[in-house]
Structures are given as C-alpha cells and as structure tokens.
Amino acid sequence: MQTIRFEREATVGCIVLANPPFNRLDQRFSGCLREAVHEASESDIRVLVIKAEGPHFSFGGEVREWPGKDVNWFRTFVAEVNVSYRAIEALRVPTIAAVQGCAFGGGFELALSCDFIIAAENAVFRCVEVTTGMLPIAGALQRLAERVGRGRASRFAMLGEPISGALAGELGIATQVVAETEVIQTAETLAKKLAVGPTKSYAATRTLLKAWSAGGIPAADAVMLDITMDLFNTDDCTRGFLNTAEAFDLDKEPSDLIFNGR
C-alpha cells in the first residue's frame, strides 16, 4: 500500500499522507516521504502542499513498533525522519502544510518543516513526546522556540499542552485558521498564488531566513548582498523593475505581474 504519494496539477505539487485515519510515522514513513520529496524536487513545480487523507493530519510516531528495539535502531529511525524533514526544508519552492484534526509529535514537526501552515479550527498541535519520557525528535523544540519564543517552546514541550488551531493562529504557528471544510481550498488558493509568483525570490527568502536561523542577524547580513545580486539578472526581477518603473511614471500602483519563475 502506498502510504505517501506525490501528485501535481500544473506547477502546484502535493504530497499526500495516505494512511488514514491516523497517518502515523511507521518504519516505512521516512523512505516513502523522501521518495515523494525527490519526485517533487525533480519536477518543475513552483509550490508544494502537504496534506493528509482522513480526519487527522498525523498522530506522529508509531510507538507500537518501538518496544524491544535497541538504541541503534532508534537512532537510525530518528535520523531518517530528520533527513526526510530537512529535505522538505531544502526544497527551492515554498511549502504549505494543510492541517486538520490532530498533528501530534512527528506530525506537528512535519507541519513545522513548512513555510506556511493552514490550520483547521478543529486542529490540535501537540508535542506528545514527554508522555513517553522522550523529547521532540525531529526539530519541534527549536522550531517552536524560533516561532513563539523559548518560554512557550519549553511549556509546550515539557508540559505536552495541546495547542488549538485558534491558539496556533494567535501565536503565529499557523499562518491562517479556517473552518475544517475550507482547509484544503484555502491551502490550494495560497498555492496557486505562490505558483505564479517570483519563485527565485521565494527561494532566496528561504535561504536568507535559514542563514538567520543558523547565526542570527550577523549571519544573514553576511550573505544577504550575494543572495540579492543573484536575483538582479533574473527575468522576473527585470520585468518587475520595469513594471514598477512604468507605474511610477504614470503615477499609479504597479499592476500585478504573472511571474514565470525564471
């Protein structure tokens, strides 16, 4: 059974978690996810949506597989999950997670690997690892600290408190919170908007933010000039400058451009 698949419509790609109702991270998960990410990377998509079949985004790790395993097995399992999530972060296109129901543990971390999270009002995000004596194993703690601050990240990781869709929106974890019936449509609308945007500019923005995450403002400042200059001769930038200059000459707002991603 194919538990994760890659689909596309024109330049909008989609990775579907297809193991409902819980979409757990079992032993097959990382390999299937990496394969789907590679398919996305090798295609000419300009945006990627990650969504799930069934009532829940993902309940996280399939803990029933873990008892009786040794530490070397668990280390490899955790490493493979992290590699698959970092592969998503390494893509050169914007990424969107469409989350309904529960996003627990590794499911929460999968959503946090994306640039945008569209959350249903019934969504519940939770770092459940503390209930097993573990901590978030695929990057939730540090990514939460980056988004909501160290204090809140400690609270959510150490106390395992659930985060409602509404609270996720208030804290900036979720980009937008909508009715459950509107999650996919909202994510697809955002994806279509990004798919006709300046793709290289989006990739550069992601690169600069990664530099900031790694080394703060000094690290981002150190690479910002080169990243900016790489955009200067792109077709999108050339057309964008011209469109804006012409609008200024006519004393009006620049018209919306359909960028070609080059």
Give short role names for the model-derived ranges.
Residues 1-53, 86:
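Conserved CoA-thioester-binding segment of acyl-CoA-metabolizing enzymes
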Residues 1-9, 19, 160-165, 185, ...:
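C-terminal alpha-helix plus adjacent terminal tail
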